[in-house]
Amino acid sequence: NKWVLLLAHSYGITTTIDQMLFNGITQINELDAKVAQSRNQSIKLVAQAKKLQNGTVASFLLPQFVDHADQLYFVKNEYNGVVIESGFADKQFFYGKGAGSFPTASAVLSDIAALRYGYRYEYKKLTQQVPSTLSGDFHLRIYISFEDLANIPKEEFASIEEWHSGNERSYLIGTIPLKSILHKDWWKTNNTSLVLMPDNIIENTALTELKKMSLSLAGL
């Protein structure tokens, strides 16, 4: 719900959580943590919104591998981190407590003070002439770990770049269209876990180049 409010602020998009791609971290297991450690990464729950080349917005809330060089890597416990990027201001990082008695009390006190002066909350992006819309036309680069390959729809992947097989648990890394995981349960059941890769949004133009590269590596 917090992410829905931020979408309204940043892009003027009105939506509900049931229309979004989201999941928590309860399915993350020991193998996933070991893979992250071997790559000098950590797994964080990250909400993202990015304007695509066609003007629509890709948005989701999922566990993600975060590189050690990324500022979000060091965000832990009750702290939150926000990264904002614009055409003129480049990247900006905000860091602070998102839970606890004092941060909550401070926010409530701020709202009470605002009411005294007749302040009304505004969503200025909702009044823009051409509101942004959520996109369903992009691919995601994901890591999937599982116990039984039969539960994974391999045919849905546009490409699979890594495959590791183990005695009890295996994983793969590949690129899959949003429609293959949005409102689908295969990646949430049968002890399956999904984690986004750091560079995870693949637009159609980039996907075409990815397929060309795959064919080239295959000698076709």
Descriptions of predicted regions:
Residues A58-S145:
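Catalytic, metal-anchored helix/loop core of enzyme active sites in primary metabolism
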Residues K44-Q48, A99-I112, S170-I181:
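A short, terminal or domain-edge coil/loop segment
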Residues K2, K34, K44, K50-K51, ...:
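Context-gated lysine
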Residues N1-F74, Y79-G81:
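Substrate-binding/catalytic subdomain of NAD(P)-dependent oxidoreductase enzymes
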Residues A47-A49, F65, F88, G98, ...:
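A broadly conserved detector of short glycine/acidic/proline-rich loop/turn motifs that flank catalytic sites
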Residues I13-I17, E30, V46, Q53, ...:
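Generic marker of "main functional regions" within proteins
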Residues A33-I43, K91-A99, P103, E161-E168:
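Short secondary-structure transition/capping segments
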Residues I112-L220:
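A conserved regulatory-domain signal marking ACT and ACT-like small-molecule sensing domains
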